[in-house]
Amino acid sequence: MIIGLGVDIIEIARIKKVYNKFPWKFVNKLFSDREQKKLMTLHNPNEYISGRFAAKEAVAKAFGTGIGQVRWKDIEILTADEGYPVVNLHGEALNKAEELGVTKVYLSISHSKTSAVANAILWSD
């Protein structure tokens, strides 16, 4: 059963501007150590950062809270060996998921040259 649905779209140029101005402050605020490790392997990180930003926003919106009641790092987006995004919840996001009975978070991330979009579904068995 679907518990929540969230979607977010972001302009890659907007993320690129902030990242170029405050690279490590921005990255440390948004990403876990494992997410940062993946970021370090990329030649052009703007799509990755934008997609993950949109994904975290989409998951937070699916909870009905948005970012603010959960921290950016409470929502960790990794990549499965098969290439699809995997959501790991921590802290307040995990507490909220347990409170709502969430058993799985489905996530889709896509990019164009100018935008990144993400859609998140909170699922309960």
UniProtKB/Swiss-Prot annotation:
EC nos: 2.7.8.7
Binding, Mg(2+): D8, E57
Chief place of localization: cytoplasm
Reaction(s) catalysed (UniProt annotation): apo-[ACP] + CoA = holo-[ACP] + adenosine 3',5'-bisphosphate + H(+)
Transferase recorded as keyword: yes
Protein's cellular compartments: Cytoplasm
A GO molecular-function annotation: holo-[acyl-carrier-protein] synthase activity
Cofactor(s) annotated in UniProt: Mg(2+)
Function: Transfers the 4'-phosphopantetheine moiety from coenzyme A to a Ser of acyl-carrier-protein.
Record-stated family: Belongs to the P-Pant transferase superfamily. AcpS family.
Protein name in UniProt: Holo-[acyl-carrier-protein] synthase
Organism: Natranaerobius thermophilus (strain ATCC BAA-1301 / DSM 18059 / JW/NM-WN-LF)
Gene responsible for this protein: acpS
